[in-house]
Amino acid sequence: MSLKIKSKITIGVLLIIFLLSIIFTLENVSLAQTSPQISVYKVVGSADLSNPGSAGYWSQIPWTNISLTANIPMAPTSGLTHYLLVKAAWNGSWIFILEEWQAPEPAFNAWSTAVAGIYPNASGPGLFRMIELTPGTTYSLERNYTNYVSIINGKEETGRIVFNYSGITLPAPNNTEITVMSNGTILLWHSPRPVEDLLYNDGMFYGYYVNSTWYYPDRAAIMWYLGSGVPTKDDMNIGGKYPGQQFDGITFKDAGGSLAQSGGSANIWMWVSGATWNNSTYDPAFKSNIWQNESLTGLSYVDSGNHGFAVPLYTNNTNMYEVDTAGIWYTPVASEGLNGSLFFIWTGAKYENGSWVVEFARPLSVPLDYQPFMPNITVGKTYYVAFAVWQGRLGETLFDKSITSSFLSLELVTTPPTSTTTSTSPVTTISSAIPPVTLYVTIIGVVVALVALVILYVVFRR
C-alpha cells in the first residue's frame, strides 16, 4: 500500500473521529442547555379554588403562552382555541396549575353526555352527540336490506342508509337516524364511536352539530406522560370502543382514546364545565347534586366538601380508562379499591372577561393504589405534559379539540418566583414544536457533517 493511500485513509479516519466527537459534544450541549418549558415555582401558601388565580403568589409568576392546534385539521370546528396561558406552582406538598383561555361563548348548563347517562332526569343540551356531515355528502336508502331500519327526518323506514361523498360510499349501521336540513346538510344522531372513525377516514366528518339550544360542555385537560424517555406523540387514536372491536362487519384495530405513543401510558386530568365545575347555577351535575349520591355514581364514596374536581383518566396503547371503580366516562381501571380517586384532583373555575380561568390542585404524592395510573411529582425530575381545550358551544367535543402539537417539559424548581414581576406578569410564548436550543444544535451538526463530507470527497478524489 502506497504512502499516499495510507495518508488518505489516515485523514479519513481522523475526520470521521472528529465528526463523531463534534456530534456527541453538540448533543451534550443540547441536553445541558435545555430548560423546562414550564417551571413550577416554589411558593408559600395554598390554593383558593373559590376564586382561582387569586392567591398572592400567582401575581409573581409569569404566564407561559402555549400554542394550540387543531386535533382534526380538516374540521372547521377543530382548533378553535389558538393559545392557552399557563402558570404553575408548588408549596411542598401540593402542585397548582392555573390556566386561562379565551372563550367567546361559554357552554353554561350543558351536560356531560356520560354524566347525563347516569341521571334519569337529565334534560337540555349535551345529552348526546350529533354529527354534521361534510357539505356535499348525500345519502340513499337501500331498500333491499329488509332487516335494516333507518330513521329519516323522524320517520322510520325499512332499508339501509348509504352515505356518498365524492364517490366514496359508506353504509350506515342498523337503526341509524339522520335529519336532512333544508339546505341539504345531513345530521347524524347518537353517533357510536366506530361510526365517527369511519366518517373521519372517509372525509365525511365535518364537525359536531350545535345551535343556540344544542351544544356541549367546555373542557380542559392536562396529560402527564408516564412512560420512559421523551415522548414524541401526544395524540390519541380514533377507533372503536376497544381494540379489535367488530362493528357492522368492520374490525377496528385501535380503541378510541388509546395513546398513540408506542409503549407509553399517560394520566389525564379532565375538567368539564357540565360535570366537575362545582357551580350549582351553570353546572347541571352539581345542580342535581350527583356527586353526593352513591346510588347514582356507583361509587362507595362522595365528593368530600362538594368541591370541584378533574376526572382522572388513564390511557395506554390498549384503551382509555377512568381511575375509579365506577367508570362513568370510561371503563374503570380497577374493580375495587381506589377509594376517593375520582375526586382526588381538585379544581376551581370561573368565567370572566370573556375567558375561562381554571385552577388544578393535587397532592404531589399519590396513594399506593393510584400509583400505576397517576404520577408522583417530585423535585429533580422532568415531566412531559400536554394540554387540550374544548369550546363546546362552538362544536368541540370528544376527539374534536384544540391541542398542543407535542409534549412540553415541566419541572419543579426550588427557587421562588421573581419579586420583580407584578400582577401584569410578562408572557413567555412557547410552541410545542422543537425547542430552539435543540433546533440550533441540529443545524450546526448538519453543517459540520456537510463540511466533513466535502473534505472527505476532496481527499479521496486526489
Curated annotation (Swiss-Prot):
Topological domain spans for side Extracellular: 27-431
Function (record text): Monoheme cytochrome whose physiological function is not yet clear.
Record has Glycoprotein as a keyword: yes
Primary residence: membrane
Segments on the Cytoplasmic side according to the record's topology features: 1-8, 457-462
Glycosylation sites: 28, 65, 91, 121, 144, 164, 174, 183, 211, 278-279, 293, 316, 339, 353, 376
Cofactor: record remark: Binds 1 heme group per subunit.
UniProt xrefs under InterPro entries: Cyt-c552/DMSO_Rdtase_haem-bd, Cyt_b558/566_suA
Organism: Sulfolobus acidocaldarius (strain ATCC 33909 / DSM 639 / JCM 8929 / NBRC 15157 / NCIMB 11770)
Record field: transmembrane: 9-26, 432-456
GO molecular function, one term: metal ion binding
Pfam families: EB_dh (PF09459)
Gene behind this protein: cbsA
Name of protein: Cytochrome b558/566 subunit A
CDD domains the UniProt entry points to: DOMON_b558_566
Membrane topology field: Multi-pass membrane protein
Gene Ontology cellular component terms for the protein in this record: plasma membrane
Annotated GO biological process: electron transport chain
Protein's UniProt keywords contain Metal-binding: yes
Subcellular location(s) of the protein: Cell membrane
Modification after translation: N-glycosylated on at least seven Asn residues by identical hexasaccharide units composed of Man, GlcNAc, Glc and 6-deoxy-6-sulfoglucose residues in the molar ration of 2:2:1:1.
UniProt cofactor(s): heme
Keywords annotated in UniProt: Cell membrane, Electron transport, Glycoprotein, Heme, Iron, Membrane, Metal-binding, Transmembrane, Transmembrane helix, Transport
